[in-house]
Amino acid sequence: MINITLPDGSRREFESPVSVMQVAQSIGAGLAKATIAGQVDGQLVDASDVIDHDASLRIITAKDAEGVEIIRHSCAHLVGHAVKQLYPEVKMVIGPVIAEGFYYDIYSERPFTPDDMAAIEQRMQELIAQDYDVIKKVTPRAEVIEVFAQRGEEYKLRLIEDMSEDITAMGLYYHQEYVDMCRGPHVPNTRFLKAFKLTRISGAYWRGDAKNEQLQRIYGTAWADKKQLDAYILRMEEADKRDHRRIGKAQDLFHLQEEAPGLVFWHPKGWSLWQVVEQYMRKVYRDSGYGEVRCPQILDVSLWQKSGHWDNYQDAMFFTESEKRTYAVKPMNCPGHVQVFNQGLHSYRDLPIRYGEFGACHRNEPSGALHGILRVRGFTQDDGHVFCLESQIESEVTAFHQQALAVYTAFGFDDIQIKIALRPEKRLGDDATWDKAEAALRSALGVCGVEWQELPGEGAFYGPKIEYHLKDAIGRTWQLGTMQVDFMMPGRLGAEYVDENSQKKHPVMLHRAIVGSMERFIGILIEHHAGAFPSWLAPVQVVVANITDAQAEYVDSVRKTLANQGFRVSADLRNEKIGYKIREHTLQRVPYLLVVGDREKENGAVAVRTRSGEDLGTMTVSAFIERLQAEQAA
């Protein structure tokens, strides 16, 4: 007798082994029709998988997050089915699930075109309409090799070669004549795959290495139903309008070019925006007791070997040589801050000591991963490090938490999730040290009275970290600030203080950043605000425009008055109609446009308009200054 325990605690008995689908059928025809997969004793399995022992079972449908992920994975296989029917000569590589979608990498002698993508999507719809069952067969490894060898799928064979010899059998999933291998689970029938859309094609490299052959990557998205798909498409259309690259070009903020992949050319208005963010964060440093420092861009590799970066991070580092010495361009600022700390003798009474730096770092990101200013190779962090006693961790983390929330609120973010990234597989130190570090973060967040989610395996190699995930105006989540506890690096780099017993001890090192990469944060700000920044943040806060040449001198005097008050202001004295000027600066998302005609000139006033088209009427220059000052960030 097989006893199956359901999520509500009820039990069902079966005389012999039973499949997930059969259990669903015993509950009701409606549930059976909706069943995508099952979760047996916490493990996701196919609907066709048989349960041969007493177990707990949760039926997975499209209403579950796991169900939507399975739909996406099955859609990737459906891409393979359609592609092989249309282009039988191509070679299939791999098709994983990603956030809100999936992709499939394919080797093709020629690049796919938009017409190809349309044809593939059409064929997928035709295959879905056939309403066929997806068949799973657990197959011995040798037979799997034979299956793909007969089909000439050399990349599948390479993937099998990389698998552990302990794997003696694999799941093959058959979409009619098409077969793919996968851990699964997958949908039992193509009727679950109707709400999908292919989104784009890009290039990729085999194993992510530019030295290897180039592949074609077909991206798509899939959802539980058409309503969810349509909502996603609307979100993506809005995201496209907000694309920081589009707005950056339209507002003349920055550009990127082929000769400097992953590096940003900042234009005057973009650099003005940067400076507003940097000066705001510099004030945060000062108010929080951080001494600002500046450390070298390149350091001898011996220092990176001591810090642990050489063993754990060298693939992402740039190197250079001079006079038979090898140097690394810094990917992180922490070892430099330890060198500053090490230049003096410190007592336990001196701690905590806090350093902050707008530190320029470089990381050798794969070219395919670069994305505007959101993913770059050269970036600047609002990086800070606190050297403290173990007893001070809680108060320092608590203070940082409050500080970070205040910054995010000032920049317009109020939906914030907090997560703790725990020890990764590849790490420094022993489990006892990690236990202590992770407990310290949990304790500090507990004192703050906040809820958090834990992320096993996602901490840095030298310590666990708190992560701040911010939701933007269109519901996307961005990971920004971090606070990391590090018991390892101070010892590796010789950081010491003298304790109350005159003994030398290693301090705890806290790594913290609030906005993280300045480039990325500015890209997020652009998209969050759709280029319509709050007046305190806008690259140009005010434009003063004349109606005729008769007001030119007065316009310039107004500009100077505002500039002398520290506002970012420009004058538009072009020989253009005022309606044209208003439209142009409105499109540039300038917060305020001050229009000056003869009446305003005579009265020492300005006519104030907002970028939303609101007419605020005529006011004195001093009254407008008071209004603008009231809108500045604290």
Curated annotation (Swiss-Prot):
Entry's Gene Ontology molecular function annotations: ATP binding; metal ion binding; threonine-tRNA ligase activity; tRNA binding
Domain of life from the UniProt record: Bacteria
Region (Catalytic): 243-534
Cofactor details (free text): Binds 1 zinc ion per subunit.
Family annotation (InterPro entries): aa-tRNA-synt_IIb, aa-tRNA-synth_II, aa-tRNA-synth_II/BPL/LPL, Anticodon-bd, Anticodon-bd_dom_sf, Beta-grasp_dom_sf, TGS, TGS-like
Ligand binding (Zn(2+)): 334, 385, 511
Protein's UniProt keywords contain rRNA-binding: no
Entry's EC annotation: 6.1.1.3
Annotated localization: Cytoplasm
Keyword list, A-Z: Aminoacyl-tRNA synthetase, ATP-binding, Cytoplasm, Ligase, Metal-binding, Nucleotide-binding, Protein biosynthesis, RNA-binding, tRNA-binding, Zinc
Example GO biological process: threonyl-tRNA aminoacylation
Recorded catalytic activity of this chain's protein: tRNA(Thr) + L-threonine + ATP = L-threonyl-tRNA(Thr) + AMP + diphosphate + H(+)
UniProt key word Signal: no
Database matches in SMART domains: tRNA_SAD
CDD domains cross-referenced by the UniProt entry: TGS_ThrRS, ThrRS_anticodon, ThrRS_core
Reported cofactor(s): Zn(2+)
GO cellular component: cytosol
Role: Catalyzes the attachment of threonine to tRNA(Thr) in a two-step reaction: L-threonine is first activated by ATP to form Thr-AMP and then transferred to the acceptor end of tRNA(Thr). Also edits incorrectly charged L-seryl-tRNA(Thr).
Similarity field: Belongs to the class-II aminoacyl-tRNA synthetase family.
Subunit structure: Homodimer.
NCBIfam families the UniProt entry points to: thrS
UniProt cross-references to HAMAP family, sorted A to Z: Thr_tRNA_synth (MF_00184)
Name of protein: Threonine--tRNA ligase
Gene: thrS
